[in-house]
A protein has these predicted regions:
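Short, conserved beta-strand element in jelly-roll/cupin
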Residues: 35-37, 47-62
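Short acidic-glycine-tyrosine-enriched beta hairpin
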Residues: 66-81
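Ligand-binding loop in jelly-roll beta-barrel domains
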Residues: 81-106
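A short, N-terminal "cap"/entry segment at the start of jelly-roll beta-barrel domains
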Residues: 1-28, 109-125
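Structural motif
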Residues: 30, 59-61, 68, 84, ...
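Conserved short histidine dyad/triad with adjacent acidic residue
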Residues: 15-17, 32-46
């Protein structure tokens, strides 16, 4: 695999109904470029991976360890491994960038869909 890829060329994986992630895996981390359809709830879940992220488009209400906050473009979040969390996209949906350590092995086997540009910018070359 090339070390250089456009986000739009990464193969999307269906993580939940209404949630597509374009994962990029390295040896110790996974970065996910995630699109959440308008109003979709990412149900409460937990994983051993640490997770940090930011909102790139739209808005999302994150609930982390029972605390909720609406996040907008440019705002960040941090979730320790094992902590329960959920998210609900705003009326226009959301695109977030998530970084996980260690690698999200479960995302490697998630069902995929054919790549398409989606909501991520095309390279400007």
């Amino acid at each position: 695999m090339s070390v250089f890829r456009a986000v739009s060329q990464l193969t999307p994986a269906r993580i939940w109904d209404g949630v597509l992630a374009r994962p990029l895996h390295a040896d110790r981390v996974t970065i996910g470029f995630v699109d959440i359809d308008p109003g979709v709830l990412v149900p409460e879940h937990r994983h051993d991976n640490e997770q940090v992220g930011f909102v790139q488009r739209g808005s999302v209400t994150m609930t982390i360890a029972g605390q909720s906050r609406e996040l907008r473009v440019g705002e960040t979040y941090s979730i320790a491994g094992g902590v329960p969390h959920s998210a609900r996209a705003g009326a226009d949906g959301a695109s977030v960038v998530d970084v996980f350590a260690p690698v999200r092995e479960d995302w490697k086997t998630a069902p995929t869909v054919d790549p398409f540009p989606g909501r991520w910018p095309e390279p400007s070359r």
